[in-house]
Amino acid sequence: MAVKLQADEISSIIKERIENFEIDVDINEIGKVVGIADGITTVYGLNNVMAGEVVEFDNGAKGLVLNLEEANVGVVVLGTSAGIKEGMSVKRSGALLKTPVGDGLMGRVVNPLGDPIDGKGTIETAEYRFIEEKAPGIMARKSVHEPLQTGIKAIDALVPVGRGQRELIIGDRQTGKTTLAIDTIINQKGQDVVCIYVAIGQKQSTVAATVKKLEEHGALDYTIIVNAGASDSAALQFLAPYAGVTMAEYFRDNGRHAVIFYDDLSKHAVAYREMSLILRRPPGREAYPGDVFYLHSRLLERAAKLSDELGAGSITAFPIIETQAGDVAAYIPTNVISITDGQIFLETDLFNSGIRPAINVGLSVSRVGGAAQIKAIKQVSGTLRLDLASFRELQAFAQFASDLDDYTRSQLERGQRMVEVLKQGPYVPVPVEKQVVIIFAGANGYLDDIAASSVTKFEAELMPFMEAKYASVLDAIRNEKKISDDTDAQLRKAIEDFKTSFAG
């Protein structure tokens, strides 16, 4: 028997069907590649694309939109441009570039997109962040007041760095810039500080040697290495520092402390210049584009010490700049000097004369780190900078003067010994309490009767002696962070006690 449907039933069924009817339409804006040269493609037809948006090519390659022109857009290819041809389709993603962040990245070597390149398998990270983020404003920040110990005597005593500071490391090639960075990373062991080392445009063998050195000292466990090598495209080299600081911001925003090294921003500027010239942007001084200052300022402003309300986390930045024949007045060096809170200037002549780290104390400065220096170091190194400056002056004068009075001679002798005190081998950072002890010995004349050539031996033997017999003095300096009258007396007694047994 056939079922009879009433007219109102039919209309209600049709109405229900109409209400539940959905058209699943996937609307994509698709453009076409009209030109490609040196990793930069010109794409036609993406009328609504955003600056900084990620686009996808037919062959799966990804690109980043940098130029928005009237008819076309300039897209840099992220990775290799092999396989991209004219006429190929390009699809919008609607998303800006992101990179993975989090604890899962520690101990790994990644490219600027967050993909692992160390052969240790995939990285488990739950969070992604935009590579370009706005720097914290004035009210979100707090003044730099906590010390960041580098373990390098000359820096901690004369050019102190605080958490949240930007301190430039500048010098010619082969003057020990990367060594300073590695030393500082090694010295953060046990300090609950995450280190990020960004290698830009370096040889893969150099980066491999750095990774090996960090592994040997057990420092890779709390370090992330972001590598855009010399063989990688200019686009990846350009993105590397921004990816690195995005990873650091995750720790800063969670109330933790991070240190980031950009090695080096000279190559970063060169990569940006290469991209800009191919994108036909007008060149300026030294053929760099007009916004090369903003390139570095927006990067370095993201290093900050956050206020207590925002968790009091910090990012300390150490940008590295390579100069040509000591020319600090070139375009990129002067730009970065003006952005940072001080600079550590390394000199070839000092390096070649055996003074290592080859820090020029006269030209190096820390504009905000003094507020972060612990009192014990301030007490022993108060006049050290002036003493070394007058020593250099006297040294130049003594070359021409045959007979010197006793005071001048004693100043020269003291200066020579202080220069020896500040010398240090690579990859052996010195804890702050031991720095205080040896600088105290030099500043108070305990090394005046020790031959300058024996100062290093004196220090090497003094430290085990202090640990064995006067550990309480080292503990007092470490815990109180100052030299009390009692500690001062104990320290003098310890050094005098050691000198009786020292055979220089």
Swiss-Prot record:
The record marks 364 as: Required for activity. Its main location: membrane. Keywords: ATP synthesis, ATP-binding, Cell inner membrane, Cell membrane, CF(1), Hydrogen ion transport, Ion transport, Membrane, Nucleotide-binding, Translocase, Transport. The keyword Nucleotide-binding applies. ATP binds at residues 171-178. Its EC number is 7.1.2.2. Belongs to the ATPase alpha/beta chains family. Produces ATP from ADP in the presence of a proton gradient across the membrane. The alpha chain is a regulatory subunit. This is ATP synthase subunit alpha. It comes from Sulfurovum sp. (strain NBC37-1). The gene is atpA.
